[in-house]
A protein has these predicted regions:
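Canonical tetratricopeptide repeat
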Residues: 34-35, 68, 102-106
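Canonical positions in the second alpha-helix
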Residues: 20-21, 54-55, 88-89
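Residue-level recognition of tetratricopeptide repeat
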Residues: 28, 62, 96-97
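Terminal, low-structured helical/coil segments at or just beyond the last alpha-helical repeat
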Residues: 84-130
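Structural marker of alpha-solenoid helical repeat scaffolds
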Residues: 24, 58-59, 91-95
Length: 130
């Protein structure tokens, strides 16, 4: 159900279907990865990272989870952490690993722009006479 919704471009319905499947099969790595991929496609990298990390807790050598986590990190602008995932992938399956290709390409691209937060901006104090 989730795959069909995702194939038709309805990521919201896919996420709902995968979340329902997760209640039936809690801890299922394949469902977690599908849910993580769908949430990442929807632009919810933080939520995707959570699902990738739960999948990695269940299967620490899962190449798809390491790749997905790295892609989500790169999309958030955390290229240093994403680079660690690339090194980990290359250690697991060698320099010519097909799984590291999307992550290597994402890291080669320009990093995502940093989000502006209230703490990263300082207001200029302007004092004027009345």
């Amino acid at each position: 159900e989730g795959q069909a919704a995702l194939a038709s471009g309805n990521t919201g319905a896919a996420i709902d279907a995968y979340e329902s499947a997760l209640t039936v099969e809690p801890g299922s790595v394949s469902v977690l990865l599908a849910l993580a991929d769908a949430t990442r496609q929807e632009g919810m990298q933080g939520k995707a990272l959570h699902y990738y990390r739960v999948a990695l807790a269940n299967d620490p050598r899962n190449v798809a989870a390491i790749t997905g986590e790295g892609l989500a990190l790169a999309e958030k602008g955390a290229t240093e952490k994403a680079g660690r995932n690339l090194v980990r992938l290359q250690a697991l399956c060698g320099k010519d690993c097909a799984a590291d290709s999307p992550l290597a390409e994402a890291l080669a691209r320009k990093p995502a722009p940093k989000m502006v937060t209230a703490t990263s901006v300082t207001a200029k104090t302007l004092i004027s006479e009345n």
